[in-house]
């Protein structure tokens, strides 16, 4: 996982330069699933996490907006907004739960992968699609006429293999790294979410750092995010053809999936029009 490598790079840089702290990393779900992590960072049980902001929607409903389907026009649009003025807007909200956004990074563009060919909206009817534990993602799959199954990603390979779910949606880098191509052989290039993830830090822990260590931590995270974004953008340029070499069928769908999704989702995204002005 590139995200794990990103955070280990940040940790190494912090530990090489900080004066009053030492950071230990726990990758690959060792500290629990998404719900455990987002609760843990609020309560101070975990100091720093990477997560999709939609995972905080139970406490900050507006946090889910930045993962809305078809919201971002490009990766550059997302980066400009979330590392610019919209970051300040979000940080004000996250202060309410004692969490600080340290930075946003490009997780990848989410695509649909299934156990049968999907090239149009009608093909999705009745299918069981795994999603993250997020109302926004559940609503998106409802717009497709499919059934959403929230599930921890570490349980997903087996669920795909046994047919508990018919498909899932994630960036191709995730599809590859978790080897989901071994159990589902169809990728539909829906490009439905240009997906940000964020590095979050417990507010009390941040406030307890010296000025020197604050600068070290923020610089290390910024450097790691720059590396991560470059890695994902480069990998995505060749991944479709690499997956074809592994026996995966790559499908370009018609416009019916997008046309069903945007009108269903957009009314619930308060800042949709404002975010478009940040491109």
Please place each PLM-identified region on the residue numbering.
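N-terminal secretory/targeting leader peptides
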Residues: 1-76, 85-86, 94-279
């Amino acid at each position: 996982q590139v995200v794990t490598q990103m955070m280990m790079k940040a940790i190494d840089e912090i530990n090489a330069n900080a004066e009053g702290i030492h950071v230990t990393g726990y990758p690959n779900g060792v500290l629990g699933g998404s719900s455990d992590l987002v609760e843990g960072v609020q309560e101070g049980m975990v100091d720093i996490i990477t997560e999709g902001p939609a995972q905080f929607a139970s406490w900050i409903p507006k946090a889910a907006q930045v993962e809305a389907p078809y919201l971002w026009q490009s990766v550059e649009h997302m980066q400009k907004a979330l590392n610019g003025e919209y970051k300040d807007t979000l940080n004000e909200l996250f202060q309410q739960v004692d969490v600080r956004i340290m930075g946003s990074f490009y997780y990848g563009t989410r695509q649909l992968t299934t156990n049968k060919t999907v090239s149009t909206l009608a093909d999705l009817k009745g299918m069981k699609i795994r999603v993250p534990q997020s109302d926004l993602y559940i609503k998106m799959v409802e717009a497709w006429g499919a059934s959403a199954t929230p599930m921890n990603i570490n349980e997903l390979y087996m669920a795909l293999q046994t047919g508990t779910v018919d498909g899932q949606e994630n960036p191709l880098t995730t599809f590859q790294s978790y080897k989901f191509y071994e159990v589902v052989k169809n990728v539909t290039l829906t490009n439905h979410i240009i997906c940000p993830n964020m590095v979050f830090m417990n507010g009390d822990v941040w406030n307890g750092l010296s000025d020197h260590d604050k600068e070290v931590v923020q610089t290390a995270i910024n450097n790691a995010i720059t590396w991560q974004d470059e890695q994902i953008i480069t990998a995505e340029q060749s991944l479709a053809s690499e997956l074809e070499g592994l026996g995966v069928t790559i499908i370009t769908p018609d416009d019916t999936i997008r046309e069903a999704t945007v009108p269903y989702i957009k009314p619930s995204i308060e800042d949709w029009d404002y975010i478009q002005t940040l491109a």
